[in-house]
Amino acid sequence: MAQSLAAALALLLLPAAAPAARVVESFAPASAAAWTPYQKAPKPVAAATGIAFPLPFSKAVDRAAWDKPVALDLSAATAFEIDLACPRPEAIRQFGLYFKSGGGWYAASKPMPGPGLQTLVFAKSDFSTEGSPAGWDRIDGIRLSPWKGEALDAALVLHRIAALDGGSLVVVRGTSSCPNDSERAVAAKTTERVSRLLIEAGIPHSLVTDDDLVNGALNNAAAALLPYNPQPSAPQLKALNAFLARGGKLGVFYGASPALASAMGFKLGPYTKAERPDRWRSIAFDDPVAWLVPPRIWQKSHNLFPVYPGDRNSSVIAFWENARGVRQPEPALVVSPRGFWMSHILLNDDAQSKKELLVALCAHLDPSLWAPAAARAVRDAGRVNDFQSLFHALSEIERRLPHAADPGATRALLDEVRSLSAQIQAALAAGQHRHALLLARRQRQLVLRADAAVQLPRPGEFVGVWDHDGTGYIPGDWAFTANHLAAHGVNALFPNLAWGGCAHYPSKVLPASDTLRLYGDQLAAVLAAAKPRGIQVHVWFVLWQLTGAPDDFAARMKKEGRLQIDAGGNTRPWLSPHHPANRQLVLDAVAEVARNYPAIDGIHLDYIRLPDSQSCYAPTTRARFEAATQAKCRAWPADVLAGGKRNAEFRRWRTADITALVADIRAALRAANPNVKLSAAVFGSIQPDGGNIAQFWPDWLRAGSVDFLTPMNYTESSAEFSSLVRNQVAQPNAAGRIYPGIGVTADESRLDPADVARQIVLARQAGCPGFLLFDLSGTLRDETLPALRQGLTRPTPP
């Protein structure tokens, strides 16, 4: 018999080591008067363990703000943590953090994660500048600025702002080692990705550029990462070689320098491009247990700079595998006494596994990094769903045990979680940080499994999955995908089978894609596999984008003036939705699919909008706008740009033009096959004039132009997700027509199974008949869907 909850949880209250953080504001209750209200914000007051900032958001205000003078040097900080709590997080649309520096500000904002005590993390790369700040080393003020969400009063209690300063690890952003602006942009994005994963893992690090190398940027470092620095200059190579000579360790991703590879004991192979998109799909270690990494790390790479052992002291530790799990000849990772080398950059798929990979590789370079990584893993072990601690998680899961299909088995998981707490504390006390990390990861996985098990299923729920590649898990094997999805409760599949300039099925309207040539008719194949298993098929159209289009098709579109043109007169590789021929192309493509494949359940529109405010200012757009408004523009596009006298009128017109196109698609679809439903992926937020993207989907619902919508509510904040869904279902004619999109592996969000479960529950509470998961991936296959099947999507008795 398990011991009592109170006694068992006592171990969970033992203090755990935390990653080093420099507190820059403690919010001592007695210091409330030091915060000056900005404009008409109420005065803050002392709280039990912090300062409470009243939020008068039932009034007609956009935000509240408070300032405090400081004198801080934050130049060494890589990120900032803020501990705060709000019982009504829906009152806050975004929490803004501002650092004043001379004549300007560093500004950033994020949504509240949820109710109760939360920790917001701001990377330095999250901050933009306003005015002309003097530098991070001269911070003379802090401003807190919650922006109004829902119209209700609340209080926000702040407890701490801490700076996460760099340590023995340096991350080097590629600048002059990149040959052009495009490559430098890739380097910046890749470096930011690596830094964020390190921050989440608790690994302290500094950020420099490769231009800083010659100025001694690595003088105090034990290890350095080069996330994408393809061609270091001779002076940079000299600095890197000097760093290696004094015992420093390097981790290189997708390097193109044979000299640097040789200096590290490796041999660089030639640039290699995959002849098939399923060639390199995952990384598999020879000994994942020894390296403390998952058995398989998902990554869809399309090109490599293969690297091989160069001497007897270097070796391969991981290889690439294809979509079927077959090992490929190219090594993914090699190591030597001087560091490691990966044959591609670190992409953004499978974020949790990538984080564990980075911890292992960085600790290989500098074993002292096991300690902060273990401390973070211990802290985060119970922070799943909206739980604030391990104690909170176990208390809530214990309360919900009767909901589990097998309460006894779920209770056993909780008992193991409790027993692990004592082992973790013993390991930390003995300085066994690597072992403590392993135990904390195990503990978190058990909490995730237990949380999944106590979720309730809902019979008849629409459970959909987007497939961005349009080829299933394994190209050429739709049966495998359909079997797996059906076995895990998925009853609707949205494969991406058509783009602006190509199709994955035979078409007389759109050119053939490479996917069609390699794997055959994907629409026929998915229908044959999915329909017998009770899975609906909604054909996903990505409109306007020419990704994958043959060169001759794109050239013809440009010659015919059918591409979008920005305000500077530059052509963009997108078809213009305002061009009559492009609109007809969409109508013909939709009708063709509906006629030729009558077994489909729906047509799903994506990018049924403009990409941004930079499009479209082509001559055809001007002609149609002037004809519709019966007024010529004297200065084009100046008249319709922001600040122009006809800007508001133009924004309304472009939005109405998209709305009219949706109605035309509906009419064409009804004529071709009245049994096929029409849906669309839309932005979650609603702008009255359609915003920069010209998309006001409430009008589509009001007119009955769509059967349902799938708002892309891609956020890691349960509070923001809940607010979005409640607003969406409140729109006229929206009842039963909102199927929220959940960003499991979206660029904007990376969700573990508990995060996904929480958002599904919130969608149910708002009255939604179902949901969609973005998107089909190894993470979805191995983690998300199996977890959901334990509770939320488990079979129910008839």
Predicted regions and their residues:
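Extracellular ligand-binding interfaces
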Residues: 54-133, 138, 147-157, 162-165, ...
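Extracellular ligand-binding/catalytic regions of CAZymes and related secreted enzymes
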Residues: 166-171, 193-197, 225, 328-422, ...
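Helical hinge/lid and interdomain linker segments adjacent to catalytic or ligand-binding clefts
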Residues: 179, 183-264
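Catalytic domains of carbohydrate-active enzymes, especially glycoside hydrolases
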Residues: 197, 201, 477-502, 598-599, ...
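A glycine-rich, often tryptophan-bearing local segment used as a flexible ligand/cofactor-contacting loop or short
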Residues: 230-303, 310-316, 321-323
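Substrate-binding cleft of secreted/luminal carbohydrate-active enzymes
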Residues: 443, 705-721, 728, 734-798
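Active-site-adjacent "subsite" loops/lids of carbohydrate-active enzymes
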Residues: 460-465, 523, 527, 538-597
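Glycoside hydrolase catalytic-domain groove-lining segments
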Residues: 628-750
